[in-house]
């Protein structure tokens, strides 16, 4: 559901952006959220998800090792963000994932993709299939890293759906997205330490993810999330003009959600809401409850106007 932007007293300097309250699912802000974007390194969220799903199902282990191909190595020499792996290196899935998540290594993406699916092209098919499963209706993946390709596209709304899935289904692995650095103890060379590229992690605001992106055709992008006092917000923006504006505007958007809206717990799944009469049953009444916690996000100025009602329409 969406809270109308007519409330909004904020303008985000991005080509497209969206903000969601995680628990309620309410959209608190949107700006052209369904226009096509080139997701750049935000693509790596899906690359990671494919691996996490396989690990969760028992079909892949963090200790499994993949051999680096020449194709993967070439990406480390082409000026892209890299883990700096070498042809023939045997690298664990765990190290490759850290190289993808923290160092944003395009070379690590290809090594992981080839190790899982045989070729990067086959891996991209898995990525697109997963996107469709998640309801990412305007997304297609053509590679594992997000390097420029007209067939590698998405929307900020779809990136939001992907980010929600990551946080919901893989909370333990999601913690890796908040790590500030990763050291690659490579064979036959000095260790390489790289810092996380997400600027919000270095601010004292509760940010714990997710992934930056940059392409010349798209400018700067960021999928970000913070959690404060148990409340999580997710923001996705693309088309920021500079690195500084990406950091500033993303911070502004998340802060807007925190300061202008409250998250209200309507009902816990374990709590009885009411009792209803039973016709010709063993009991005269049964308890009524919901099967999941219900949350509502509401503008702070309208919080006192919130009313909850139960409507019982009888047995079906």
Q: What do these predicted regions represent?
A:
Residues 136-137, 148-153, 157-316:
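Domain-terminus/edge residues, biased toward the C-terminal soluble/receptor-binding domains
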């Amino acid at each position: 559901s969406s809270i109308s932007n007519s409330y909004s007293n904020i303008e985000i300097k991005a080509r497209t952006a969206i903000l969601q309250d995680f628990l309620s699912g309410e959209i608190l802000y949107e700006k052209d959220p369904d226009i096509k974007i080139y997701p750049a390194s935000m693509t790596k969220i899906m690359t990671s998800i494919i691996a996490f799903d396989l690990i969760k199902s028992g079909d892949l282990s963090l200790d499994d090792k993949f051999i680096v191909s020449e194709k993967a190595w070439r990406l480390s020499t082409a000026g892209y963000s890299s883990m700096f792996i070498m042809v023939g290196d045997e690298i664990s899935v765990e190290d490759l994932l850290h190289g993808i998540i923290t160092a944003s290594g395009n070379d690590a993406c290809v090594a992981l993709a080839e190790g899982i699916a045989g070729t990067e092209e086959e891996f991209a098919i898995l990525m697109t299939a997963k996107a469709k499963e998640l309801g990412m209706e305007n997304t297609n993946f053509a590679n594992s890293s997000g390097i420029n390709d007209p067939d590698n596209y998405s929307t900020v709304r779809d990136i939001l759906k992907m980010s929600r899935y990551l946080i919901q289904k893989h909370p333990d692995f999601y913690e890796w997205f908040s790590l500030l650095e990763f050291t690659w103890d490579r064979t036959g060379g000095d260790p390489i330490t790289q810092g996380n590229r997400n600027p919000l992690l270095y601010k004292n605001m509760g940010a714990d993810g997710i992934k930056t992106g940059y392409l010349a055709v798209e400018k700067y992008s960021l999928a970000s999330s913070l959690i404060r006092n148990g409340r999580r917000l997710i923001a996705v923006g693309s088309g920021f003009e500079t690195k500084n504006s990406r950091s500033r505007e993303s911070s502004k958007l998340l802060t807007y959600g925190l300061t202008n809206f409250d998250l209200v717990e309507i009902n816990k799944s374990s709590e009885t809401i009411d009792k209803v009469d039973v016709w010709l049953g063993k009991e005269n009444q049964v308890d009524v409850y919901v099967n999941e916690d219900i949350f509502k996000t509401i503008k702070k100025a309208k919080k006192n106007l919130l009313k909850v009602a139960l409507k019982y329409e009888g047995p079906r």
